[in-house]
Amino acid sequence: MTDIKKVNLLGLSPEKLIEFFESIGEKKFRATQVIKWIHQKGAESFEEMTDVSKALRAKLEQICEIRGPEVVSQNISTDGTRKWIIRTEGGKNDCVETVLIPDGDRATLCVSSQVGCSLDCSFCSTGKQGFNRNLTPAEIIGQVWIAIKSFGPMDPNGPRRVTNVVMMGMGEPLMNFEPVVDAMILMMHDHAYGLSKRRVTLSTSGVVPKIYELVKRTDVSLAISLHAPNDALRNELVPINKKYPIAELLEACQFYLENLPDKRHITIEYTLMSGVNDNEEQAHELAELLKVLECKINLIPFNPFPHSGYEKPSNNRTRRFQKILADAGYTVTVRTTRGDDIDAACGQLVGDFHDKTRRSQKYIELREVKS
């Protein structure tokens, strides 16, 4: 007799959880009870849910489960940054990385959306590793669940252990649209994690059609991985630009802002690489390019990884680039490198997985030819 596959309630959005409970003949309020137990109290079993009837708990035990991803390891940087390697349902060689960055009374969790990445940005370690598959909603929200639970029993009335979530880990979130949206809805729902829409940020390399779709589904904050002031250079650094060039991307960003219920800005992410995109002329070009968009700019000095071929710019060069943009009227921040001693900094996440694209092997072969 074949075992019945249990429904994992961890990844169900509130709407889908209500639908599920109604489908098994239960009242809507039961879904609210269960979602609070899972996401606010960290319950791992139905037996813990003391305000749920014994009969319903027994029923759920038969057909459901609460199963998060498995933590393979946790590393803590000298600056307090934490990195988890998390095993997904794909097996022992399908692991992603999740990073928690503390900063005073803030704690930002960087969440992965894919096992590997389906894009091939030239300066990103994840992209060099290739791609296996998309994460499920349970594997995405499970990263938040794991991070919060790592500090001990969850207390819905205590201080927030995670104040901000950024979809900036491994993978391109908009290439895994539905699971990412479901997970973000859970992050912001009052009965789950209750994060403000301004404190949940999705970062994309520019999957233009999905930006138009995203604003119809949710109103999270949006960040764009731009990294170049023109199409010629961006085509080299961010290959998806060949399909969706900068003008189309900025037009989609403008549409996103115009359709939000409140006034906000887009965050432009720009990784500075020495001798590649960090000269004064390029700073002026970027300032001119972004005049059409309400935005702030986050400069990210490149974080080296083996065989990347790029170098971090000098502090003087970074400050000069920042000043040119600030003088043009932009709010400009320079991201402080955090967690680089445990390979948890921006662009360094690689995980451990089977690469279906053979991209990682191709890069190894290419390096051997050049050496």
Swiss-Prot record:
PANTHER family: 23S RRNA METHYLTRANSFERASE, RADICAL SAM CORE DOMAIN-CONTAINING PROTEIN
Binding site for [4Fe-4S] cluster: C117, C121, C124
Note: Reaction proceeds by a ping-pong mechanism involving intermediate methylation of a conserved cysteine residue.
Family indicated by similarity: Belongs to the radical SAM superfamily. RlmN family.
Signal sequence interval, chain numbering: none
GO CC list: cytoplasm
Residues bound to S-adenosyl-L-methionine: G171, E172, S203, S225, L226, H227, N303
PROSITE patterns referenced in this protein's UniProt entry, alphabetically: RADICAL_SAM
Cofactor binding, per record: Binds 1 [4Fe-4S] cluster. The cluster is coordinated with 3 cysteines and an exchangeable S-adenosyl-L-methionine.
Disulfide bridges in this chain: C110-C346
Enzyme class: transferase
Subcellular location: Cytoplasm
Name of the gene: rlmN
Cofactor dependence: [4Fe-4S] cluster
Reaction catalysed by this enzyme: adenosine(2503) in 23S rRNA + 2 reduced [2Fe-2S]-[ferredoxin] + 2 S-adenosyl-L-methionine = 2-methyladenosine(2503) in 23S rRNA + 5'-deoxyadenosine + L-methionine + 2 oxidized [2Fe-2S]-[ferredoxin] + S-adenosyl-L-homocysteine; adenosine(37) in tRNA + 2 reduced [2Fe-2S]-[ferredoxin] + 2 S-adenosyl-L-methionine = 2-methyladenosine(37) in tRNA + 5'-deoxyadenosine + L-methionine + 2 oxidized [2Fe-2S]-[ferredoxin] + S-adenosyl-L-homocysteine
GO biological process, one term: tRNA methylation
EC number(s) on file: 2.1.1.192
Residues annotated as the enzyme's active site: E97 (proton acceptor), C346 (s-methylcysteine intermediate)
Function, in words: Specifically methylates position 2 of adenine 2503 in 23S rRNA and position 2 of adenine 37 in tRNAs. m2A2503 modification seems to play a crucial role in the proofreading step occurring at the peptidyl transferase center and thus would serve to optimize ribosomal fidelity.
Record keywords: 4Fe-4S, Cytoplasm, Disulfide bond, Iron, Iron-sulfur, Metal-binding, Methyltransferase, rRNA processing, S-adenosyl-L-methionine, Transferase, tRNA processing
Protein name (Swiss-Prot/TrEMBL): Dual-specificity RNA methyltransferase RlmN
